Amino acid sequence: EPYDVLDIFQENGFAIVADDLAQETRNFRQDVPDDDDALMALARAWNEFDGCSLATDANKPKGQMIIDAVKKYGADAVVVCMMKFCDPEEFDYPILLQEFEAAGVKNLYIEVDQESTAFEQVKTRIQTFAEIL
């Protein structure tokens, strides 16, 4: 996520206890096993990859995985930093929201853009959320 957004979290007293970033932690959640056919091993690992909107999975376990992480790490809330125009993640968000609300997990949705340099709207939303918590 853009560093400016991380600074806004810090300024408002947030501590990030876990993340589920598609190009970060999610990539390291499981190892690709050693195999003579490296491409086949990579394909099998991708086929068995749970909790990623980019990987087709009719069971949609991502919401429960995040809820489990909230409990494991004692998080007060979940902040969904949605990368603009990431259709697979945007498509799954209503499912996540429904699961968060059913589990009583407080949550905030913000849109971010890697190219953005202005974060005033995001800052206002995070400040308001901090006051609610």
List PLM regions with ranges:
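Acidic-and-aromatic substrate-binding clefts and catalytic sites of carbohydrate-active enzymes
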Residues: D57, C86-E90, E115-F119
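Short beta-alpha junction loops
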Residues: Q23, K84, V112-S116
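Peripheral docking tails and interdomain loops at the edges
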Residues: Y93-L133
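Redox- and metal-dependent alpha/beta enzyme cores, enriched for Fe-S-associated oxidoreductases
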Residues: E1-I66
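A short, acidic, amphipathic alpha-helical segment used as a generic capping/interface helix at domain edges
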Residues: A58-G74, F91-D92
